[in-house]
Amino acid sequence: MQSVGHAFKDALTAGSELAVIAEVKRKSPSAGELRPEIGAAETAIEYVRGGASCISVLTEGPRFGGSPEDLKAVKLAVDAPVLRKDFLTTPQHIHDASAMGADAVLLIVEDIGSVAEVADLQDLALSLGMDALTEVRAEHDLEMAAEAGAYMIAVNQRDNPKDTRFTVDHDKAVRMAGLLAELGPEIVTVAASGIETPDGTKLRDLAGVGYDAALIGEALVLSDSPAKRLQTMLNTLG
């Protein structure tokens, strides 16, 4: 693995408490319209004010209401590292993320399909000065991610939409924590989906089983005051 800057990874591991990646999204396939009117830059500023370590920006339009312009606007508005969240499966997608100014890209094992391709896309991202966050949904995905040399792994608690219509398993991240720990303390671990929603997984529970960070979208987007909502979440860790 090449020795390059890791602004995104470093931001997630800089403190002693669990970090938050706050997500900018206007809608989702599971929930429909969330806040279609929000501005990406203004939302990101609120997130950082509330204590977000990093920002995730959806750049996919039809299903999530995002765009590359959202990511560019966020990069201009905040100093926090920015993740491009999209269905990235080709080298061109990674080059596009770099051109947008992303500090990190999301690599979804299930969508990419092979260990070799995951490894190649991660290496490409690193060569362009970006981090790679590798997403897994199941134990099989985790095995592939480890074989590909993933150094940041996100457990998505939302199941395969082909089978379950985006059902969220709120215990999945906690259940998989032991498997992640077996990969070694150098792996940066992230929990995603269903975090701090009304019936969702709590930050304190994720911190208790060793996660480094949580990616939170819906619970913040739907809040009238994202900064205060995030501060309240983070205060539960103290």
Q: What residue spans do the PLM features occupy?
A:
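Catalytic cores of alpha/beta
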Residues: T89-G101, R137-G149, V188-I216, K228-R229
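C-terminal helical cap(s) of enzyme catalytic domains, especially alpha/beta-barrels
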Residues: K172-L179, R204-A207, L220-G238
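Glycine-rich phosphate-binding active-site loops on the catalytic face of alpha/beta enzymes
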Residues: A99-A116, A154-R165, V209-L230
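Active-site beta-loop-alpha junctions enriched in small/polar residues
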Residues: E23-K27, E60, F87, E110, ...
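Glycine-enriched alpha-helix->loop->beta-strand junction motifs that scaffold or abut catalytic
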Residues: G51-A52, A77-A80, A99-V105, L126-M130, ...
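N-terminal amphipathic alpha-helix/helix-capping segment at the start of soluble metabolic enzymes
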Residues: M1-L34
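N-terminal active-site wall of soluble small-molecule enzyme domains
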Residues: A19, G32-L133, D141, A173-A177
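Conserved, mostly hydrophobic/aromatic
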Residues: A22, Y47, I55, A97, ...
